Every structure is written in structure tokens, then in C-alpha cells.
């Protein structure tokens, strides 16, 4: 059944941090599919994302204080599904999806080469919101590379485009 507040534009959020797994520290690059996000201020330019408390990306963003909002075209629908279903604790989502990792311009965080645009964000506030945490990030760099049909999530595995 469609949700009252959908469809919502789907983004891929990337993040990076050193985390401890099974007694070993390793650098983790992760991608999470997010449909709950929005601009929250023009001056300064702020953007908010909502991450579930059980997600691996939550710990990464809390520690690193940075994330990249990757706006994706409709043709990356399968990558969005993979990144929404697999856990970053057990999978390298860049390898699983075939997406290309690039370094960001102003923060220590990867971005996705195939994205049509980016917002590089430094976390300035965390808000506890039930079973999610809302991260408010100050946008340190933004770029729109091309204007393509974007991906919108309806419900389940169903998507639309513009």
C-alpha cells in the first residue's frame, strides 16, 4: 500500500570511519539508502538526514561527523535496493553494487562517481527521533553534475521517476 507521504526522493548517503570489528580496527566505507531527508536552512546551508538506530551508518556518522548526500538517477535503482538491504557491517557496498568511490572535496568521506549531484556535510547537530537519529549537516561543498531523472521511493521495492 502506498504511503501517504510518498513517493520520496531516494538518495545514497556515504560515510567513512575506522571501526572495531571482532577486536580488529579497520576503515569502513559505507553507503546507506535514505528516503527521509531534507534541506533545513539557507543561511547557513544545512541538510538533514534520518538514519535508523540499528544501521551501521549511524555509528560511522556519529564518530566521523561527516557524510555525503549523493543524488542518484533512476538507473541506479538496483544499487539503491542493494544498499538498503545489505548491512555495512558485513558487506562492502561499493563492491556489491559496482559503484565507483571518489574522494570528497572538503570532508574525509567518499562520494559516488555515478551520482548526478552531491552535498558534502559536516555534522553540527544530532536529534534523537524515536527509532531514528536525525543528523543535521552544514553543507561544505555542493555540486550538480547533470540533470537526469531522479529516483523516488514509493513503498517496498517500488520506485518512480520524475
PLM regions and their residue ranges:
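Basic, polyanion-binding surface patches
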Residues: 1-162
Amino acid at each position: 500500500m502506498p504511503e501517504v507521504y510518498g513517493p520520496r526522493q531516494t538518495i545514497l548517503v556515504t560515510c567513512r570511519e575506522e571501526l572495531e570489528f571482532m577486536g580488529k580496527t579497520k576503515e569502513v566505507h559505507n553507503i546507506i539508502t535514505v528516503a527521509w531527508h531534507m534541506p533545513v536552512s539557507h543561511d547557513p546551508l544545512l541538510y538533514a538526514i534520518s538514519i535508523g538506530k540499528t544501521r551501521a551508518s549511524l555509528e560511522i556518522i556519529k564518530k566521523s561527523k561527516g557524510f555525503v548526500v549523493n543524488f542518484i538517477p533512476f538507473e541506479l535503482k538496483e544499487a539503491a535496493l542493494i544498499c538498503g538491504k545489505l548491512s555495512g557491517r558485513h558487506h562492502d557496498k561499493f563492491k556489491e553494487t559496482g559503484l565507483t568511490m571518489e574522494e570528497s572535496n572538503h570532508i574525509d568521506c567518499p562520494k559516488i562517481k555515478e551520482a548526478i549531484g552531491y552535498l558534502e556535510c559536516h555534522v553540527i547537530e544530532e536529534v534523537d527521533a524515536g527509532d531514528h537519529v536525525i543528523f543535521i549537516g552544514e553543507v561544505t561543498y555542493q555540486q550538480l553534475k547533470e540533470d537526469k531523472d531522479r529516483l523516488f521511493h514509493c513503498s517496498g521495492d517500488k520506485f518512480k521517476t520524475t
